[in-house]
Design a protein with these regions (language model features):
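Solvent-exposed serine/threonine-rich low-complexity stretches and specific carbohydrate-binding patches
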Residues: 137-150
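Exposed aromatic-hydrophobic patches
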Residues: 148-168, 221-224
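Intrinsically disordered, low-complexity acidic Ser/Thr-rich regulatory segments
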Residues: 195-232
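Short, aromatic- and glycine-rich surface loops/edge beta-strands on solvent-exposed regions
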Residues: 166-180, 187, 224, 228-243
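Substrate-binding/catalytic cleft of secreted carbohydrate-active enzymes
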Residues: 1-82, 86-119, 134, 143-144
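Short proline/glycine-enriched turn/loop motifs at strand-loop junctions of beta-rich domains
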Residues: 122-127
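Edge beta-strands of extracellular beta-sandwich domains
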Residues: 243-254
Length: 254
């Protein structure tokens, strides 16, 4: 490319994926990730001067556009300046104010088949600690984001178990295999499980004589969130002082 002729992307997303603040969770999450995809792709190119997303706010339009209500839902905020999830993608790229948002309310009843699918953290913090029913599960950082060209890209939550399976007193190999399978069920559901998880299941059956009854029990106890005490999640955004290495929680989501 000719570096003497600046190249600027003047519009992306917008009418290609209209999103309302009251759309279902998967739609709002996809909207946010589409914005992150473009920002990450542009940041990876040295010969692109920048990009402008369409657009900041929803707006009134003519009778032939919008959702039959003469409103274009193209913004990362609604027309009253209330942020959609996609706004967090941009808010994360500054460091003046702490940001911590999740792509999910963590309510299984919001999703088809009670499968949450992939859940992302949006933050500009140095670390995010995840707790389930006050039990520590995992700590995430910006380095865990698949959006490697963004300073603060969305972070995929890949563990809902932590060390909780130690209560089952399994052998190390069995515990690792069960944890891998349960976390995969959380992300993909049964219908979209990767083939490698089927192989893991067969290995658990042959090596440790596990059966379907045991698998269902473990799923209901550690993943299913059905009945019993309500499952609560807590996420803490943590900033680290560069000079003293002291850590402080700057924002919490429950």
């Amino acid at each position: 490319s000719d570096m003497e002729k600046p190249y600027l992307i003047s519009e992306y997303n917008g009418h290609m994926y209209p999103t309302k603040t009251f759309d279902w969770e998967e739609h709002r999450a996809e909207h946010a990730l589409r914005h992150a995809n473009v920002l990450d792709a542009v940041a990876a190119e040295e010969d692109i001067a920048g990009c402008f997303g369409w657009c900041m706010f929803d707006y009134n339009t003519h009778k032939d556009f919008g959702s039959g209500d003469r409103i274009c839902y193209h913004g990362v905020m609604d027309m009253f300046r209330n942020p959609k999830l996609a706004a967090a993608v941009y808010a994360c790229q500054q460091e003046k104010e702490p940001v911590l948002e999740l792509s999910s309310s963590m309510d299984i009843g919001e999703h088809p088949g009670c499968n949450r699918g992939e859940t992302y953290i949006f933050t500009n913090a140095d670390k995010v600690r995840m707790y389930k029913n006050d039990r520590f599960i995992k700590e995430y950082s910006a380095a865990d984001s698949p959006y490697t060209h963004l300073k603060h890209g969305p972070i995929l939550i890949d563990d809902f178990i932590g060390d909780a399976l130690q209560e089952e007193h399994m052998k190390p190999g069995q515990e690792a295999g069960v944890k891998k399978a349960l976390n995969a069920f959380t992300r993909f559901g049964f219908a979209k499980l990767p083939k490698s998880i089927y192989a893991t299941g067969i290995w658990l059956i042959l090596r440790y004589h596990m059966n379907m009854e045991e698998a269902v029990r473990l799923y209901n106890k550690y993943i299913g969130d059905w009945g019993g005490t309500s499952t609560t999640y807590r996420f803490e955004a943590v900033m680290v002082d560069v000079s003293t290495r002291q850590e402080r929680v700057v924002k919490t989501i429950i």
